[in-house]
Design a protein with these regions (language model features):
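Short alpha-helical elements
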Residues: 1-278
Length: 278
């Protein structure tokens, strides 16, 4: 059915990047009638606009159909496989090795909605009741791993699980991880030394400096949160389940990556590249 396009619709070039990773129809049964491109368009509309599932426009496939594909692609690893391939393409496009050597870790506390759900708590430092998003990104700001916890969880206590998700098999070159003072924790240092090949580097603000300070080694992680902030679905954590909360972050990042690849516009370099060459 012909319809007027939405700003979030995939272009032909973007669709060509994604289509090979979508699972084929299961053998047997009647032929698939659902247009998977329209399913993805609906999911991108949902994440960018922040609407509820039942408020997905009627031009798209039924919301239950879209939700079922969304959950199926979480369970079978489609989102992760697609993100890994696009990330490597972006790194190669920028003249980098497809596997990172350097990463940055950071977190963001966000409010949850009144519907409740798993893993909610209070972040006393940020004065936020809800959940905390922990991200590990490469030197271009591309997502390597994501973990969602209660906002009450300390950043240093969540870091081991986040690092464990960045498996050595997936990132064998990864050695240096930049972090801020929240990760200056003796137990974390001990865990990293005993369980990984990483070197955790704490980036300190200049002496005598007060207020906000732009730290080049960590600015890349803040920029990734800014990219994600364009998606209204992420302005709060609207999900009941942690797995779906993490999936929404991956979809928002997926949209960033396909738009960058399809337009062939590499991410701008950030300062002190000699220290952060990856």
């Amino acid at each position: 059915m012909e319809r007027n396009p939405y700003p979030t619709d995939l272009t032909d070039a973007q669709w060509k990047l994604i289509e090979p990773f979508l699972p084929p129809p299961l053998p047997g049964g009647r032929p698939r009638k659902t247009d998977l491109r329209e399913v993805l368009n609906a999911l991108l509309y949902l994440v960018r606009s922040g609407c509820q599932w039942r408020m997905i426009p009627h031009e798209f496939p039924p919301w239950k159909t879209c939700y079922n594909y969304y959950r199926a692609w979480i369970d079978n690893g489609t989102w992760d496989e697609l993100a890994a391939s696009l990330r490597m393409d972006i790194r190669c496009q920028a003249g980098r090795h497809e596997l990172p050597k350097v990463a940055a870790i950071d977190s963001q506390s966000v409010k949850t909605t009144e519907q409740g759900g798993e893993e909610r708590g209070y972040d006393g430092g940020k004065k936020v009741s809800g959940r905390k998003r922990h991200l590990l990104v490469d030197s271009l700001g591309m997502l390597l791993a994501v973990l969602v916890t209660s906002a009450a969880v300390d950043d240093a206590h969540a870091a081991p699980e986040l690092f464990a998700r960045a498996e050595s098999e997936a990132f064998p070159r990864l050695r240096t991880i930049y972090a801020d003072q929240k990760y200056h924790n003796y137990d974390l240092y001990q865990w990293v030394e005993a369980n990984t090949d990483y070197r955790l580097h704490i980036v300190n603000r200049p002496p005598q400096q007060r207020g906000f300070v732009l730290l080049p080694q960590r600015w890349v992680a803040e920029r990734t949160f800014a990219w994600l902030g364009r998606s209204r679905r992420l302005s709060k954590d609207c999900e009941k389940l942690i797995t779906t909360s993490e999936a929404m972050i991956k979809i928002a990042m997926l949209h960033v990556m396909v738009r960058r690849l399809a337009t062939a516009t590499p991410a701008p370099e950030f300062s002190y590249q000699a220290k952060l060459a990856a």
